[in-house]
């Protein structure tokens, strides 16, 4: 893992960023950082969460299941699902995008699941690394790129991996 690939302002997780994720209903929130903790307490968001990690395995626990997130995979967490995050090491890098719910969202977005990441998604994830915080609809081309990122997920994520155990 190369920490130089993380924007300077977002090198370590600021636990208060989670209160900002839902500050603006129509924004897409972007956050890349080293976790630097052994545990992120149970919480939830009003937005859907795309979670990709590097540098170690991450366990995500919900009220129903415990998910095992390996390298080169992402976890889709629909809005409103309570979850806690347990990295295998505090040096794990979290790459998050939080998307507002849309009336025309495909059924894919309502189901929590783990999916493999291909080279296209890796490149898009790394492209968003330069962004930190809210991205508003008036911020073009950022908002369109982030929206395209979300819209392509169902097409690229045809095979959910059953890497979860009942809790």
Question: Which stretches of residues belong to each language-model region?
Answer:
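A generic beta-sheet turn/junction motif
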Residues: 46, 62-64, 89
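Short acidic-glycine-tyrosine-enriched beta hairpin
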Residues: 64-79
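Ligand-binding loop in jelly-roll beta-barrel domains
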Residues: 81-112
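Generic protein-terminus/edge-of-domain signal
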Residues: 1-57
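Short hydrophobic beta-strand segments that form the core of ligand-binding sensory/regulatory domains
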Residues: 49, 74, 84, 94-100, ...
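An amphipathic alpha-helical interaction segment
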Residues: 114-167
């Amino acid at each position: 893992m190369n920490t130089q690939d993380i924007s300077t302002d977002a090198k370590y997780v600021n636990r208060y960023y989670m209160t900002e994720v839902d500050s603006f209903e129509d924004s897409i929130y972007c956050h890349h950082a080293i976790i630097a903790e052994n545990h992120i307490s149970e919480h939830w968001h009003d937005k859907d969460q795309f979670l990709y990690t590097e540098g170690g395995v991450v366990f995500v626990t919900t009220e129903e299941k415990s998910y095992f997130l390996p390298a080169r995979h992402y976890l889709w967490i629909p809005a409103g699902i309570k979850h806690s995050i347990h990295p295998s090491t505090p040096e794990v890098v979290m790459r998050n995008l939080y998307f507002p719910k849309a009336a025309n969202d495909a059924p894919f977005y309502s189901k929590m699941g783990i999916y493999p990441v291909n080279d296209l998604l890796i490149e898009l994830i790394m492209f968003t690394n330069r962004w930190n915080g809210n991205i508003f609809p008036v911020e073009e081309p950022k908002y369109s790129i982030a929206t395209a990122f979300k819209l392509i997920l169902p097409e690229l994520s045809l095979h959910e991996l059953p890497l979860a155990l009942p809790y």
